[in-house]
Amino acid sequence: MKGLVIKNTGSWYLVKTEDGRTIECKIKGNFRLKGIRSTNPIAVGDYVQIIINNEGTAFISEIEDRKNYIIRRASNLSKQSHILAANLDQCMLIVTINYPETSTIFIDRFLATAEAYRVPVKLIFNKTDRYNEDDTRYMDALINLYTYIGYPCFKVSALNNIGTDEVKKDLEGKVTLLSGNSGVGKSTLINAILPEQTLKTGEISDYHNKGMHTTTFSEMFPVDGGGYIIDTPGIKGFGTFDMEEEEVGHYFKEIFEYSAHCKYGNCTHRHEPGCAVRDAVEKHLISESRYTSYLNMLEDKEEGKYRAAY
């Protein structure tokens, strides 16, 4: 029996079958995916085959080939990955300038990972109602930067339902992963787009100005007009996984473009003579923040680097 994984609680998977039923399934203890060292071998968005034993317990017996997936380093196991979702048409990364602040390093790590796994990304700048003049100016500068690179952006106040109609229209007919730091208003945005869901929303920790998780498990929700939203727990850091040093520049669109003009084919864009990328940074043709993110990702082989809350 074939079905779509619509919720993952860690020990159980909720699967929607082709005949419209939803069945709670387990996976056998030895179930593993070839080539992927993951804390969760099955992810929301996966198409699977299920079998039901004589006691009526359903098991996932097989996972079908994925169109794509997006992955990050597991937060507690440095040698393993965590699959955020599978079979995506796009990701939407929710960004906040304050309350809490989303760093450009976090944004760029997410974008580079999505590029590596061939998943298009759009950015949602949320909580626009809370920003002062300086915050708004900085937000607009980031929107100009990422739009120029090739990442469409939305300006939204999910709490006040401003800009949410444009986001909702863009979701129609697509399977979309919603992601972002803890506390950026992901659940509030889903409530604005899909009011029937009434997801729990949380407060911001005063001590660290970081969000506290309100989504505990990954779950998929249908969108009016077709398509699905995949809601995942908020992320405090985004560690890359299985990305070789020489590959990192390929996943920064503008760095990859200028690297074709470097003197050396194996240029790392750090210290080599004749580096077209560093020349472009000095001429402000490549954003300094993007170049800083690139250098930061080159250091990911260092022990424990992924733990930092970027």
Curated annotation (Swiss-Prot):
Record text on cofactor binding: Binds 1 zinc ion per subunit.
Binding sites annotated in the UniProt record for GTP: N126, K127, T128, D129, G180, N181, S182, G183, V184, G185, K186, S187, T188
Keyword hit for Metal-binding: yes
SUPFAM superfamilies: Nucleic acid-binding proteins, P-loop containing nucleoside triphosphate hydrolases
GO molecular function: GTP binding; GTPase activity; metal ion binding; rRNA binding
InterPro entries: G_CP_dom (IPR030378), NA-bd_OB-fold (IPR012340), P-loop_NTPase (IPR027417), Ribosome_biogen_GTPase_RsgA (IPR004881), RsgA_GTPase_dom (IPR010914), RsgA_N (IPR031944)
GO BP annotations, alphabetical order: ribosomal small subunit biogenesis
Domain of life: Bacteria
Compartment annotation: Cytoplasm
Record: residues binding Zn(2+): C262, C267, H269, C275
A Gene Ontology cellular-component term: cytoplasm
The protein's Enzyme Commission number: 3.6.1.-
Known function: One of several proteins that assist in the late maturation steps of the functional core of the 30S ribosomal subunit. Helps release RbfA from mature subunits. May play a role in the assembly of ribosomal proteins into the subunit. Circularly permuted GTPase that catalyzes slow GTP hydrolysis, GTPase activity is stimulated by the 30S ribosomal subunit.
Record's subunit section: Monomer. Associates with 30S ribosomal subunit, binds 16S rRNA.
Family, per entry: Belongs to the TRAFAC class YlqF/YawG GTPase family. RsgA subfamily.
Protein name stated in the entry: Small ribosomal subunit biogenesis GTPase RsgA
Lineage: Bacteria, Pseudomonadati, Bacteroidota, Bacteroidia, Bacteroidales
Gene that this polypeptide is encoded by: rsgA
